[in-house]
């Protein structure tokens, strides 16, 4: 039977996901067979699994850190918010329905929790270490009785549990004390120690606080992890990408149901991006409509708020317009949706020669494609699709050459005049393509070409993990897990 190590936080945003990722890589580097696990995650940013299902981006990244192929078993329950206090429930990679928060808590949660724990038990039999991520805070008084992502999981797995806090926000010692006081005695006994995350300054100044915690709870501080600059995907925070005015003005429409906004991280690093929500803001050299959890509702939101007309006007005046997944569907001539919004036929923006019909079956695949857009013609790219729509166009953007490693020949996306749309999430992580697109636009403005890239997710994981390892008592953790 394998060992369970869990990371819980005093709040959302404490750094649980990246700390788990770092621990996954640290233990993998030490030669252990390690996998990640999160019983339930709520996220609009998902990724394809090896089984053809979808999991959260956080567990996908953690699997990469473990040097494992991402599996739905690492994130059995995924909740994807749809708006109006409803979420799509994805279990073991497949959608099983849409429910309100109350319906979910009262009807589905216990059944799914039992099934998720069966998956966890299997992982612990198959692997040496399972590193489990909690969610939010484990002691939210109004939610604790319904919580299936924190201490119920720790108790089930008898997991040694690290409690992490974001010291950069302030109040971290009070957050730890408050959390510990609200845990039961049984739950406090599972706490291995504390980690202070995102620290800036002289850690020796924190010593009196460490001594207080050890005296009061008999638990050590396991580490003080500094703020680490990185280019790793941030799971659900657009605030990680503040407005940056580069030499190109790149605008991304911040849709009410925006999803998979991690697509645009390379643009942020290469130039800077600006998320816009008002018609009067639309004027970029490059305007992008991103993916959406509710495509038709977001299209109608843009229409009602004048953003659609502003995009059309900007396009007429020379802006280049791109749509990714739901954004691609919106840019077409029409959408027939009797699945997601059930609004039937809806007129599209009309900048692309494409028509979309929604179907109940979701496509979730890794893809390799050949670009047909002239400035990058014949360039090979890879990414993934997570979609319920089927689109047709006489002018495809690319030809899919591989689907989950199997050879294919399938037209994808659409091309228009200074416009393209694609289902390829992650296309901008193909740095050669992004460089070609940005330099195409830069040349039009008389700007010198730039180089894009110089980093990779693998390198960023390794660099991040090394910093964490240097500032964490890994030896103590190994000893307490009985692995020494």
From Swiss-Prot:
The active site is at 325 (nucleophile), 425. Keywords: Cobalamin biosynthesis, Glutamine amidotransferase. CDD domains: CobQ_N, GATase1_CobQ. InterPro entries: Class_I_gatase-like, CobQ/CobB/MinD/ParA_Nub-bd_dom, CobQ_GATase1, CobQ_N, CobQ_synth, GATase_3, P-loop_NTPase. PROSITE patterns: GATASE_COBBQ (PS51274). Pathway: Cofactor biosynthesis; adenosylcobalamin biosynthesis. It holds the Pfam family CbiA. One of its GO terms (molecular function) is ABC-type vitamin B12 transporter activity. GO terms for biological process: cobalamin biosynthetic process. Belongs to the CobB/CobQ family. CobQ subfamily. Catalyzes amidations at positions B, D, E, and G on adenosylcobyrinic A,C-diamide. NH(2) groups are provided by glutamine, and one molecule of ATP is hydrogenolyzed for each amidation. This is Probable cobyric acid synthase. It comes from Thermococcus onnurineus (strain NA1).
